[in-house]
Swiss-Prot record:
The gene is mt-co3. It catalyses: 4 Fe(II)-[cytochrome c] + O2 + 8 H(+)(in) = 4 Fe(III)-[cytochrome c] + 2 H2O + 4 H(+)(out). It is a multi-pass membrane protein. It is found in: Mitochondrion inner membrane. One of its GO terms (cellular component) is respiratory chain complex IV. Belongs to the cytochrome c oxidase subunit 3 family. Keywords: Membrane, Mitochondrion, Mitochondrion inner membrane, Translocase, Transmembrane, Transmembrane helix. This is Cytochrome c oxidase subunit 3. GO terms for molecular function: cytochrome-c oxidase activity. It comes from Carassius auratus (Goldfish). One of its GO terms (biological process) is mitochondrial electron transport, cytochrome c to oxygen.
């Protein structure tokens, strides 16, 4: 890139938005093919392309921001607005699932027996695994805030410990959720209850996995001395995302697990 005498965001042309879009297409088409034809080939191909895209896009942004100094204050401001808009779009994404749930549960059709949960569905006990999951996510919200304060105060070792703890809690949540799915007395095919339950909690689980990956990248960067007390927006974005995932879970827990049971 030629020398620039201004502070604005001028990045090199990047192939990653295109490869990311192709990966998303392959994964969504692959999901439909998996459901209907029991073949996971296309979905696996999409997942591999997505992982390659993520790795190389993250690598390029780290090069631009950390080593080339392109992330000037106006650029950081733009990135902040971008992250805020992204999280706002995610809020509306989950709003659709809550709408579907409340539409189905507040006025259950006669076909469901006129009651909620529908006749024949045994809901999960909200005070067993779901309550433990709530505690785990709330604890991870505390540890990620601890990591943020440690980075701002230049406490390198504490930041690494608290970030590692947050990631472990994220994986623990995912493992508990997988166990709950495995042992659930109903499936995604069990009418509107199964659909709304598994789609809403499943997408939330996917967001936990994405958030854990985001934080894991931040942990590796913190170990490599990439973050300073003034310059650590990559971590801040991950922390915002994690808090968003936390809040969505609280709404899911209160709505679907507790009230909906």
């Amino acid at each position: 890139m030629a020398h620039q005498a201004h502070a604005y965001h001028m990045v090199d042309p990047s192939p990653w938005p295109l490869t990311g879009a192709i990966a998303a297409l392959l994964m969504t088409s692959g999901l439909a093919i998996w459901f209907h034809f029991h073949s996971t080939t296309l979905m696996t191909l999409g997942l591999i392309l997505l992982l390659l895209t993520m790795y190389q896009w993250w690598r390029d942004i780290i090069r631009e921001g950390t080593f080339q100094g392109h992330h000037t204050p106006p650029v950081q401001k733009g990135l902040r607005y971008g992250m805020i808009l992204f999280i706002t779009s995610e809020v509306f994404f989950f709003l659709g699932f809550f709408w579907a749930f409340y539409h189905s549960s507040l006025a259950p059709t006669p076909e469901l027996g006129g009651c909620w949960p529908p006749t024949g569905i045994t809901p999960l006990d909200p005070f067993e695994v779901p309550l433990l999951n709530t505690a785990v996510l709330l604890a991870s919200g505390v540890t990620v805030t601890w990591a943020h304060h440690s980075i701002m105060e230049g406490e390198r070792k504490q930041a690494i410990q608290s970030l590692a703890l947050t990631i472990l809690l994220g994986f623990y949540f995912t493992a508990l959720q997988a166990m709950e799915y495995y042992e659930a007395p109903f499936t995604i095919a069990d009418g509107v209850y199964g659909s709304t339950f598994f789609v809403a909690t499943g997408f939330h689980g996917l967001h936990v996995i994405i958030g854990s990956t985001f934080l894991a990248v931040c942990l590796l960067r913190q170990i490599q001395y990439h973050f300073t007390s003034e310059h650590h927006f990559g971590f801040e974005a991950a922390a915002w995302y994690w808090h968003f995932v936390d809040v969505v879970w609280l709404f899911l827990y209160v709505s679907i697990y507790w009230w909906g049971s």
